[in-house]
Amino acid sequence: RPSISGHVPLQAGFFILDAYGLKPKGTPDWRSLDNQAWIGRPPAAVTVSGAQHVSFDRCRIEHTAASGLDFVDAVQDSTVEGCRFNDIGLNGLVAGEFAGGGFESHLPWNPADERTICARLKFTNNLLTDCATEDWGGVALIAGIVRDTTIAHNEIDGTSYTGISLGWSWTRSANASRGNLIHANLIRNFATRVSDTGGIYTLSAQPGTVVSENAVLHPIISPYVHDPEHWYYLYTDEGSSLITVRDNWSPEKRFLQNANGPGNQWENNGPQVSEKIKAAAGLEPAFQDLLKQ
């Protein structure tokens, strides 16, 4: 566990409790996988579990050592809107399952009781700045295994690693995640300290999920990362499947589709996307006042 001596993270600050090598290596989804890991969930300033119809409206969370706000499990029909996250030590806004509780991280998560799934969440018109200032592997806005969740019109400016991350488990097999939407977000100044990242990043099978009309601007690449070229505006990683990625603006077509599963559709992404789409990304007019705080 984390201590004064530090900790070993798997990804996004989720720390390894136990791990071992696979002999022979490989799983049905990932033939070359040679390790397994069991993880713990980092703390947050505010956590929510087993709740429905919860709203965070115009709240401010800042100067944290770990994460900001975390919808941990069994949270449904809830919203975070018009909130300000600033100077966050780890992940700014977190939601969903990340294969904890003794479940191995690389296996598809399908709970017997679907009431435990975080579902029908809306994260809209939030401003997230200077995230992952203490644990550099953090993400400004990260949703693990969630269902029918909308991440829209948020603005992210400054994060050590990834802007928005959706999915978990590194598997193309069916899991509980589906029907999610990442739409019209504005992301700039990501990857300030860590590479192998994307402005928007996905993992695993997510039937019916759409990534659309986002604007991802240039990162700020640290001069001392191990591979300063290993970053992308859009990054569908291990097992990403059944996801539609369309009409996203970026300065160039720098995208990565790494070990994806079937059924992904990429349509009209890059600098040729309409300037109207680029201009509409980020905070809507009623929430522009957040930029002045």
Regions found by a protein language model. Give the residues of each.
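Extracellular polysaccharide-degrading/modifying enzymes targeting complex plant/algal/animal polysaccharides
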Residues: 1-60, 101-112
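Structured core elements
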Residues: 68-70, 150, 165, 199-201, ...
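Extracellular beta-rich repeat passengers
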Residues: 3-6, 10, 213, 224-293
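Short glycine/acidic-rich loop motifs that flank beta-strands on beta-rich extracellular proteins
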Residues: 6-12, 43, 65-71, 89-95, ...
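Hydrophobic side chains in beta-strands
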Residues: 48, 71, 95, 128, ...
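Short, solvent-exposed turn/loop segments enriched in Gly/Ser/Thr/Pro and often Arg
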Residues: 72-75, 96-99, 139-147, 168-170, ...
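Right-handed parallel beta-helix
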Residues: 1-3, 52-63, 75-90, 102-132, ...
